[in-house]
């Protein structure tokens, strides 16, 4: 579709700004290769004005975390009547809220680690309850890219982690630690892509392991049997549908030594950087990076605008 004008939204004010810019820059290069007119813009105070000036045919949402994955930008774009890539308002808001997502998974009988939620806004930081066995995985209630995720193995580490977390987030989850191999499965459209095994250089798939060169190895297709492949793909599709996600998503798993898969994280807007998992999985399925970007753009165009009460 020569002449198609695509606005790529990247950056934003959150902790995942740099990763978002990496994703958006990669998408911009792909759009140029495809012959589309790519226009980049930041999600800042001039966003609506800049979007009106660009007047794009479609928006490619390359934001991550708060503002980009929580329904905020989705609401703005629907208000303006501009088609955009990825999931809608409600699905994004639910998927970024780890507590709400886990409640839905548990209600549907889908495997997720046991967890507790702690409020850090009361002035008195919570002590480690005696009922919680260590280690625990502490993470912000609403964040992506493994930002702020820490494995707590001692009471001393708990106190330090809580103090640091209170400076960044109002609530945390403390999840049961599950040992095992890490896997990920993306959904594109209504199809589960090949499984990738993640072999992090650190003790888990941390922010650095995700985005720093050499931080992890991606084995795709994962060296697992057909039965486990099928179970992980089925789980990824179940999670995608349960949360009402669309276009694409990525679900991360841990598989215990007994072979039991557990859902760790759901990503409504998977990263599109050079070290991201989704492009690796798509390539194994026969889609180049450019073809993946093209597919996502055309999903949005085919869907069109949602409510559209204001013209850009």
Model regions: which residues?
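ATP-dependent carboxylate activation and anion-phosphoryl transfer catalytic cores
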Residues: 4, 107-109, 225-312
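ATP-binding N-terminal substructure of ATP-dependent carboxylate-amine bond-forming enzymes
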Residues: 1-96, 100-103, 107, 119-128, ...
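A glycine- and small-aliphatic-rich helix-loop capping segment at beta-alpha/alpha-beta transitions
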Residues: 75-84, 154-159, 284-285
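Short, flexible, mixed-charge acidic loops at enzyme active sites
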Residues: 73-78, 204-212, 268
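Phosphate-binding site of ATP-dependent enzymes
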Residues: 153-234, 255-262
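A short small-residue
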Residues: 3-9, 212-222, 277
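Active-site nucleotide/adenylate-binding loops and adjacent lid/helix of ATP-dependent enzymes
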Residues: 1-10, 38, 51-53, 94-181
């Amino acid at each position: 579709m020569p002449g198609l004008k695509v606005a790529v939204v990247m950056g934003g004010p959150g902790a995942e700004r740099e990763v978002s810019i990496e994703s958006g820059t990669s998408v911009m290069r792909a759009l140029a290769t495809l012959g589309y007119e790519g226009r980049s813009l930041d999600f800042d105070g001039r966003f609506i004005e800049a979007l009106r000036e660009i007047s794009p045919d479609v928006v490619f949402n390359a934001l991550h975390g708060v503002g980009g994955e929580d329904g905020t930008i989705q609401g703005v774009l629907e208000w303006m009547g501009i088609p955009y890539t990825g999931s809608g308002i409600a699905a994004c808001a639910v998927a970024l809220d780890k507590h709400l997502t886990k409640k839905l998974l548990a209600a549907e009988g889908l495997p997720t680690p046991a967890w507790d939620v702690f409020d850090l806004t009361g002035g008195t930081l919570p002590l480690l309850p005696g009922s919680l066995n260590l280690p625990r995985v502490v993470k912000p209630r609403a964040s992506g890219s493994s930002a702020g995720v820490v494995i707590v193995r001692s009471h001393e580490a708990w106190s330090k982690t809580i103090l640091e977390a209170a400076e960044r987030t109002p609530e945390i989850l403390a999840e049961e630690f599950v040992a095992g191999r890490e896997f990920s499965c993306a959904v594109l459209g209504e199809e589960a892509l090949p499984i990738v095994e993640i072999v992090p250089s650190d003790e888990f798939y941390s922010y650095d392991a995700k985005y720093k060169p050499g931080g992890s190895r991606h084995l795709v297709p994962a060296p697992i049997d057909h039965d486990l492949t099928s179970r992980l793909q089925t789980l990824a599709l179940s999670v995608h549908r349960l949360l009402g996600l669309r276009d694409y998503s990525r679900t991360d798993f841990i598989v215990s030594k007994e072979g039991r898969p557990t859902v760790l994280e759901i990503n409504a807007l998977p990263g599109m950087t050079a070290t991201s998992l989704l492009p690796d999985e798509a390539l194994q399925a026969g889609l180049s990076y450019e073809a993946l970007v093209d597919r996502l753009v055309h999903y949005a165009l085919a869907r069109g605008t949602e409510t559209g009460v204001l013209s850009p």
